[in-house]
Amino acid sequence: MPLSTSRRLALLTSASLALLAGCGSSADSADAKSTSAKVPVVASTNVYGDIVRSIGADKVDVTSVISDPDQDPHSYEADTQNQLALSKATVVVENGGGYDDFVDRMLKSGHNDSAQVINAVRVSGKTAPKGGELNEHVWYDFPTVARVADRISAALAKADPADAAAFRKNATAFKAELTPLEAKEARIKKEHGGAAVAITEPVPLYMTEASGLVNKTPAAFSEAIEEGDDVSPRILQESLALFSGGKVKVLVYNEQTSGPQTEKSEAAAKAAGIPVVPVTETLPKGEDYLGWMTANVDALASALAK
């Protein structure tokens, strides 16, 4: 989320840190023995955690901080278990861009200065447009994900040189599976380029933009929803008019941050016969990144074809 939303990512209280300090060296020793053969990795979300597992396979021990598909990541509350995992991590993968600032703060408070930290937004090279805000949901941008995979491979190889070749091979295989996803986006662009769509949040915008689609949602609407603020009546009516007036072909709906105003958008779209494509910010249970993104792109293509 934009930097301002990091205020809603609750940090550890001093009491929690005191509790962590009392965890004891015996627990640390037991954990070290159980994972000594694996590289300890912490990912801010299960999206990045799954990518790490795809590359590290059985040579990594991955902790994903945010993994509940029913939870709004914007309001996540970090805890002492997260702090403990980050204090021991050799490799850390975060999204960056204000989405998960708690990771850097917890690394600092846990005095872990040696971890290799991969910041996906920095890897992407993306910046905020002039007069606008950065869309930090870079895991919906497949070229960025490919670069992140390379960084993960390199970090794991540094931590475990004996398995470097396997990490590189796995990263290459993972990136090869991204190519069909980009081809699907190119096909959508060829068949539906210029089509207007609506969103509830900027989450899917890298996917829709790569597919040649035009977002018609008032910026004030999606920004307010992303910030957890109320949408003004005027902006809400402008958004709803997109559906009643048949001005968009699809609504892409973030299920993880739904509320009364986004539900009104969903209801208006359905009432107008406009397809709704649900998306999430974290992996649904039982899915992996590649399967999840394949389903997202396929759902978008199917909706546009109706």
Locations of regions flagged by a protein language model:
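Extracytoplasmic metal-acquisition and chelation regions
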Residues: 2-14, 19-306
